[in-house]
């Protein structure tokens, strides 16, 4: 693999990982709430 591909992809992957790390707890809470509502109905 060409090193230039890594230079281009690395910042994109870092940004995506940072976003997922910040969003994941809220997404998990929302899914759990949705599942609880579905179970209660």
Swiss-Prot record:
* Cofactor binding description: PSII binds multiple chlorophylls, carotenoids and specific lipids.
Tell me where the transmembrane regions lie: 5-23
Its membrane topology is listed as: Single-pass membrane protein
Please name the InterPro entries in this protein's record: PSII_PsbY
Q: Which GO terms describe its cellular component?
A: photosystem II; plasma membrane-derived thylakoid membrane
Residues in the Lumenal compartment per record: 1-4
A GO molecular function assigned to this protein is: manganese ion binding
Note the superkingdom of the native organism.
Bacteria
Q: Which UniProt keywords apply?
A: Formylation, Membrane, Photosynthesis, Photosystem II, Thylakoid, Transmembrane, Transmembrane helix
What does a knockout show?
A: No visible growth phenotype, PSII forms dimers, slightly reduced oxygen evolving activity in vitro.
Q: Quote any Pfam family the record assigns.
A: PsbY
N-formylmethionine PTM sites in chain numbering: 1
Q: Name one GO biological process term.
A: photosynthesis
Query: Which residue ranges does the entry give as Cytoplasmic-facing topology?
Result: 24-41
Tell me where in or outside the cell this protein is found.
Answer: Cellular thylakoid membrane
Function noted in UniProt: Loosely associated component of the core of photosystem II, it is not always seen in crystals. PSII is a light-driven water plastoquinone oxidoreductase, using light energy to abstract electrons from H(2)O, generating a proton gradient subsequently used for ATP formation.
Assembly state and interactors?
PSII is composed of 1 copy each of membrane proteins PsbA, PsbB, PsbC, PsbD, PsbE, PsbF, PsbH, PsbI, PsbJ, PsbK, PsbL, PsbM, PsbT, PsbX, PsbY, PsbZ, Psb30/Ycf12, peripheral proteins PsbO, CyanoQ (PsbQ), PsbU, PsbV and a large number of cofactors. It forms dimeric complexes. This protein is only loosely associated with PSII, and is not often found in crystals. Found on the exterior of the PSII dimer, near cytochrome b559 (psbE and psbF).
Membership in a protein family: Belongs to the PsbY family.
HAMAP family hit by this protein: PSII_PsbY
Q: How is this protein named in the record? A: Photosystem II reaction center protein Y
């Amino acid at each position: 693999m060409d090193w230039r591909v890594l230079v281009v992809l690395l910042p994109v992957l870092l940004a995506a990982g940072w976003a997922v790390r910040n969003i994941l707890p809220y997404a998990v809470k929302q899914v759990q709430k949705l599942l609880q509502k579905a179970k209660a109905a």
